[in-house]
């Protein structure tokens, strides 16, 4: 249930009854401090101004029309006209019961949409590096959240599988195969690409052959298509290992590489010309956009076809947006691409809108993100200054977690220890990233992310096992607990219950804004509130069975919420730590 939405509707009706316009915005928000209640309605200021009255006067009139019986125990006006709403303990108890009775914890399903999510996007014949981490895991958290809410989500892995470099790569693969070293060379993708580039730069005959191969590949020659396909297959097989290690839901079926849009490009250029949007300029085909200015203050020219007939990333991105609307029938498209690509995307989408390829009713959203930095505040690199391979980063995470877990559990069986180390190590890397606002850069710090205190994966995983341990000690049957009533009589019970019931509101924000850090902050808050509740409200030694069972049910909803919330982030939970 979305309590915020319920209160918004009630306050809005009361505002209209008090003379506010029908489109008034009640601005119901979760209260930041306990003394201001559970929710605040802050919309009186803006509406009172329009009505030419004092906000407090409007708030008083709204209260005469506001019926929150059975929902709120107290409603009061604070300051210049804020309305503070304190939820009724019996209402909280009833909602906790309903949440526990539902596999979805009472989370409702919005109108189902088809949502395309573009994320990860590694390049063929190159190993994934740390620069791919953010797009991959933030995008996947968004996908998991949207799917949980009931949307039809299409994962689009926009792999870099096309371009002039493929002539060079095919020529090098051919040379390696002639020397019976093709498979061995491809086992080290990074080395393969580096060696191919070295030959291309130093051997003119090789470079000439590579340029000819590009033409043959682009003309659809079967032999060159087969060689190209081999490069794609080997790369994606290696990438799949990384996706599986990261507990990311991408599979081979989600690959929608740049090559997919090639057949569309000539038609798009011709259509943009026919619509008068594209013109010839110095031999190239260009779209001039008034919305973007060059240094001289003139409309910026965006090239969609070069003088030599080649196409650009912008052309592909125009085709891509068109395809996602016309073929995939997207109601919404989310792009998890770093912030440096923002202007490029905005230009492509401006052309898309002007050409009528995607209507304004279908949002194209750039969910951009900042960079991962080292402790020195510079882009995260190896000690030698090279790019950090993602596989190497995950190996190190596993090794560090292994040491940490073994230290705390010296007698744990090896297989159990390995499983726990994997959950903690991979979880730590992912959570450290997901818990930061995606729009900002963040410092990558092993010590912080593997700490058992603070907003970290190990702390959250431990918090979950701590709640489960209460049930093990209680030795109670879940079915027997189901019929027990929930009683909210203590402040800490009410605070924990109210926060647990804000799970749907949190999911809604993550789905709308693409901000998994909001879920991390929520879960961390829940864990903290449970800790205070556990300390001050005895569960197993409660004064009677009714209170004991009620508190066990609050613990039960806490465990389920933590598990489900962490699952939407792609973070594994464990039963014991």
Curated annotation (Swiss-Prot):
Pfam families found in the cross-reference section: Arg_tRNA_synt_N, DALR_1, tRNA-synt_1d
Enzyme class: ligase
Intervals of motif 'HIGH' region: 122-132
Coiled-coil ranges (or none): none
A GO molecular-function annotation: ATP binding
UniProt keyword annotations, A-Z: Aminoacyl-tRNA synthetase, ATP-binding, Cytoplasm, Ligase, Nucleotide-binding, Protein biosynthesis
EC numbers: 6.1.1.19
Keyword field contains Calcium: no
Key word Glycoprotein present: no
Signal peptide per UniProt: none
Reaction catalysed by this enzyme: tRNA(Arg) + L-arginine + ATP = L-arginyl-tRNA(Arg) + AMP + diphosphate
Location within or outside the cell: Cytoplasm
Entries under NCBIfam families matching the protein: argS (TIGR00456)
HAMAP family: Arg_tRNA_synth
Family stated for the protein in its record: Belongs to the class-I aminoacyl-tRNA synthetase family.
Protein name, entry field: Arginine--tRNA ligase
Organism: Salmonella agona (strain SL483)
Gene (UniProt): argS
